[in-house]
Every structure is written in C-alpha cells, then in structure tokens.
C-alpha cells in the first residue's frame, strides 16, 4: 500500500459510495485497492469470471483479506458486495446446465462465508425458451436450496435491462421470486440505475425518480433494498440495452445522481460504481463527485454555478455516444414497427459490463 492513498475516504458521508475493484494477485488486494480509491464500499469478483472452476483460497489469503478489512475499516458483512459470474443461470430450462450453474454459484457463496462477507450480488439469469413462471419457480428453488446449505450470506438479486428473456427486467419478476423464498432475511435486491432506465423505468426527473422508488416500495419493499449499482446510461429510455456510461455523460445526467446523494432510503447500503473506466482513478473521481453532491443541499446545488458547469461539461463529453445509441434505437424501433424479425437476446453479458471493463484495465495494469 502506498503511504498516502490516491483518494482519501470520507469519514462523514452517510452513503457508502464505492466501486468495483480488482482482486488480481489475491482477493485481499481488492480491499487495498478500495481503500486507495476512497471507497466506502466495494465490489469484486470472488474468482475468475471466465472459468467455471478456480483454485480455492489458501488460509493465508483468507486471513489477509480479513486483516485488510479490519485495518482499513471495512465491515465485510455490510460494506462488500461481490459480483457473481455472468454465466451463472439458475433459471436455465436445461437442468444439466442449471446444475452446473448451481455448483459455481454455491462455490461463490462458500467463498463469501470463508471471507466473512454478508452480501452476494447475482444476475437472476434468463428463462431462454422455457416457460417464464416455471423458470422463476426453478430459480427460487435453487435459491432456497443454497440458503439452506449456507449460514449467513444474503443473496442480492440485481434488476436487469430488459433484453430477451432476462429475469428481473421488471420489479414484478423480483417480487415473485422473493415471494417464493422461505427465509426472507437471506434475500435482497440491488437496483442498477442503468438497467432501470434501459428497462423502461424513467428515473431522469424529480417526479419520475420519486415515482420509481414509490413503485419499488409498493411492489417489493424498501426492507429488501440491499445495494445500488451506480451507472449512467448510454442508451435512451426503454432501449433494453445494458450500456453503462460515466456519471453525467449519459441519458440520466447529473441530476439523477444529485437525487441519489440526497435519498434517505439509500443510506447505509453499498452504492457501487460500475462505470466504464480503464483504471481506478476514474472511480475515485466519481466517488468524490458523489460526495460533493451530498455535501450541498439540493436547493443549493440547483443555484450553484459550478453544478451547472459540471452538468454542461459532462453532457458535452457524452453527446456523441448518446447520439449514436439514439440513432440505433430509432432504427430498431422502425424495424419493429415494420414487423422485421429480430433474434432474442439471452443472458449473455453486454459489451459494456464489468467483465469487459476489467479486461480493459488489464491493458494498463497487468493482473
């Protein structure tokens, strides 16, 4: 660890702003990387996201992870949100493939409990060509089984962007799965801001932002809200594209992140950046942006010249990308209106997910 971290953690923030960190060279390094980036929470992969089977942790590495958490004041039960592998699909109608997913899923949960981690983020998967309701029941059955086979880790289901037959593109999907879970203290929800917007839930204005969270509370309930993934969206509302953008440069804009930094119901849970950066400096700067937004009242910010300048600058930086995605979206809309057939998407990760971002990081920071 350098004698002085690149970004100093805020000791006064009510919000656990953080980012997805690399665990290259040992899972304990994710803690050090989080500290040096100024994170108050963090995410990481528990093992290689490209392989079904990875070497188990040594006791030395487990002890080092726990020691680092204690040294840098992270509570692994509440501040760490590992991300599950993207190819885990417990809703797969092919039971052989679903069982293979379950083995990798259970390996992740066991790793969490070895490290003392209390939260685990999971993409709910895809029903593919199966019956939607039957596959939701299958997913819930696997989750119930996993909960019985582990001791304390909470499974946090992430909402999705709406492509193909992905589970979790609607809040109702998540409600139905939660309704089938026997021990509800072991299940939660992570709301991804990009996925939410892409799935057709408008959160870009004060009115629609508040309406979404009211709907979330009515359908699911705030008691299940366990984490947030913080991303802007390159694609327009309802595009069903999982395209993460840097904060303020996408269709959400800085106003949404201002509202997040003043939402009481988001206090005390991991709020984790998954924006497209090739190194951790970008994450550190965005954490400081969120803490700056938190430090001023909303009324002050709306009258603040610096706030307006930041908004204008960020929107200009993302203008080209937004225009490209809008053009693609409009072409697809015209094809749909004309009855052109299109292939259904499956639960494969998008080109802009965390895995691809971590791959880019390897070009600048060898893992």
Swiss-Prot record:
Binding site for Zn(2+) 2: 158, 192, 229, 274
Binding site for Zn(2+) 3: 195, 242, 244
List of residues binding Zn(2+) 1: 83, 123, 158
One of the GO BP terms on file: base-excision repair
Residue numbers spanned by region Disordered: 312-367
Function: DNA repair enzyme that cleaves apurinic/apyrimidinic (AP) sites and removes 3'-blocking groups present at single strand breaks of damaged DNA. APN1 accounts for > 97% of both apurinic/apyrimidinic (AP) endonuclease and DNA 3'-repair diesterase activities.
Ranges annotated as biased composition (Basic and acidic residues): 321-332
GO CC annotation: mitochondrion; nucleus
Residue positions where Phosphoserine is found in the record: 356
Annotated CDD domains: AP2Ec (cd00019)
Subcellular location: Nucleus
NCBIfam families assigned: nfo
Name of the featured protein: Apurinic-apyrimidinic endonuclease 1
Residue spans of biased composition, Basic residues class: 333-344
A GO term for molecular function: double-stranded DNA 3'-5' DNA exonuclease activity
Entry's cofactor comment: Binds 3 Zn(2+) ions.
Keywords on record: DNA damage, DNA repair, Hydrolase, Metal-binding, Nucleus, Phosphoprotein, Zinc
Lineage: Eukaryota, Fungi, Dikarya, Ascomycota, Saccharomycotina
Main location per the UniProt record: nucleus
Major enzyme class: hydrolase
Cofactor or coenzyme needed: Zn(2+)
Additional information: Present with 7250 molecules/cell in log phase SD medium.
Family of this protein: Belongs to the AP endonuclease 2 family.
């Amino acid at each position: 660890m350098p004698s002085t971290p690149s970004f100093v953690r805020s000791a006064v923030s009510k919000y656990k702003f953080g980012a997805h960190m690399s665990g290259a060279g040992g899972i304990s390094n994710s803690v050090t990387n989080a500290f040096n980036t100024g994170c108050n929470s963090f995410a990481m992969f528990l093992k290689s996201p490209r392989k079904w089977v990875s070497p188990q942790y040594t006791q030395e590495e487990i002890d080092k992870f726990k020691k680092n958490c204690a040294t840098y004041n992270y509570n692994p039960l509440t501040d760490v949100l590992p991300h599950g592998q993207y190819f885990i699909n417990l809703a797969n109608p092919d039971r052989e493939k679903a069982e293979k997913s379950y083995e990798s899923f259970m390996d992740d949960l066991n790793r969490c409990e070895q490290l003392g981690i209390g939260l685990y983020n999971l993409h709910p998967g895809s029903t593919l060509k199966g019956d939607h309701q039957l596959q939701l029941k299958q997913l819930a059955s696997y989750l119930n089984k996993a909960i019985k086979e582990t001791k304390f880790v909470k499974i946090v289901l992430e909402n999705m962007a709406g492509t193909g037959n992905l589970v979790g593109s609607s809040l109702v999907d998540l409600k139905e799965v939660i309704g089938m879970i026997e021990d509800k203290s072991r299940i939660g929800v992570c709301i991804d801001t990009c996925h939410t917007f892409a799935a057709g839930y408008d959160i870009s204005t004060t009115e629609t932002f508040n309406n979404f969270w009211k709907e979330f509370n009515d359908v699911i309930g705030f008691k299940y809200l366990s984490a947030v993934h913080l991303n802007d969206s390159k694609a327009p509302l309802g595009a069903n594209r999982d395209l993460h953008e840097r904060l303020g440069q996408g269709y959400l804009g800085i106003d949404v992140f201002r509202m997040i930094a003043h939402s009481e119901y988001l206090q005390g849970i991991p709020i984790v950046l998954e924006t497209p950066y090739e190194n951790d400096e970008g994450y550190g700067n965005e954490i400081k942006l969120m803490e700056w937004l938190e430090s001023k009242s909303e009324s002050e910010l709306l009258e603040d010249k610096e706030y307006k300048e930041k908004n204008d600058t960020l929107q200009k930086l993302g203008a080209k990308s937004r225009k490209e995605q809008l053009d693609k979206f409009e072409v697809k809309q015209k094809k749909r209106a004309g009855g052109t057939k299109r292939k259904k998407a499956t639960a494969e990760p998008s080109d802009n997910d965390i895995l691809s971002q971590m791959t880019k990081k390897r070009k600048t920071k060898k893992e």
